Amino acid sequence: MNITNCTTDASMVVRPKTVTEKMLICMTLVIITTLTMLLNSAVIMAICTTKKLHQPANYLICSLAVTDLLVAVLVMPLSIMYIVMDSWRLGYFICEVWLSVDMTCCTCSILHLCVIALDRYWAITNAIEYARKRTAKRAGLMILTVWTISIFISMPPLFWRSHRQLSPPPSQCTIQHDHVIYTIYSTFGAFYIPLTLILILYYRIYHAAKSLYQKRGSSRHLSNRSTDSQNSFASCKLTQTFCVSDFSTSDPTTEFEKIHASIRIPPFDNDLDHPGERQQISSTRERKAARILGLILGAFILSWLPFFIKELIVGLSIYTVSSEVGDFLTWLGYVNSLINPLLYTSFNEDFKLAFKKLIRCREHT
């Protein structure tokens, strides 16, 4: 997402890059781009080829992977060329298309994270009712909404840009906007509002999970103290222990449906009679949940917050940054498209099995 204000200043003029510097930068960015393509392609293939992953929650993950793949295929390569050559050599029309695709795809990737957080929040706090509403059609509508909002956020500059062919062709490809209202509209719509919503949702998700752990531990303790209760539940099907990885990655609905559907929970391990042991297990799960949520939020904030702070202060003419700083912060945001497939699938056993299956298939071919 390259929305740098076109303010120039003599103090911001920097020396040209040496050949060695250009090679190192090019190699680094090519590696990032290649890994982003491979990882997101693997997520898409895993979901498409694994029937067990055909769930509405995973459709959102798949759509996120498609969006991040578009960033890697359509945006990153031209950015590498632009940075290495120190000038834009593809003409005005390609510049316009590239900038529009860049803004749309990056905004869409961010909004996908917001929608995924919202889906998980509904699945955890209102599991039984939301399970009936959580359909492929609903996931499709959420994805369509995300793309629509992204287009409305990124397209307005097209209406006030000059559409005449420049002669000679432009040597710089940056969105030039002096519209303060649009700067505020785009930065808040693409990042600050989604960030606020994501923080609120994951905060509530964590507390819902923490409360659930405590309730399950308390229920087990009560059931273990009653022999009659044990006998009365002997014929009941044992529900599985809630797994942090399910809640933190793909589809937590199933476990929460089981938990919320059962007012009374059958006894599990009799060696958990001591309150200290139960509290220790609960605390371990809470810490694991906190770590996973911390990774998700931390990666998102570290990737995009510096860029959008820069965009706000530059767009409001508070400060001007060099092209090197702008490029670094832009690519820091792009790296989020590399991190997303790792964070949103690595903690889920179904995805791990699907990836292993894909690797085995490639080895046999």
From Swiss-Prot:
Record's subcellular location: Cell membrane
Binding annotation for ergotamine: D102, T107, I175
Positions on the Extracellular side per record topology: 1-22, 83-96, 161-179, 315-324
GO CC field: plasma membrane
Keywords: Cell membrane, Disulfide bond, G-protein coupled receptor, Glycoprotein, Membrane, Receptor, Transducer, Transmembrane, Transmembrane helix
GO BP term, example: adenylate cyclase-inhibiting G protein-coupled receptor signaling pathway
Keyword Glycoprotein: yes
Tissue-specific expression: Detected in the brain with the greatest abundance in the hippocampus, followed by the olfactory bulb. Lower levels are detected in the cortex, thalamus, pons, hypothalamus, midbrain, striatum, and cerebellum.
SUPFAM superfamilies: Family A G protein-coupled receptor-like (SSF81321)
Segments carrying motif NPxxY motif: 340-344
Positions annotated with a glycan in the UniProt record: N2, N5
Family label: Belongs to the G-protein coupled receptor 1 family.
Name of protein: 5-hydroxytryptamine receptor 1E
Species per Swiss-Prot/TrEMBL record: Cavia porcellus
Gene name linked to the record: 5HT1E
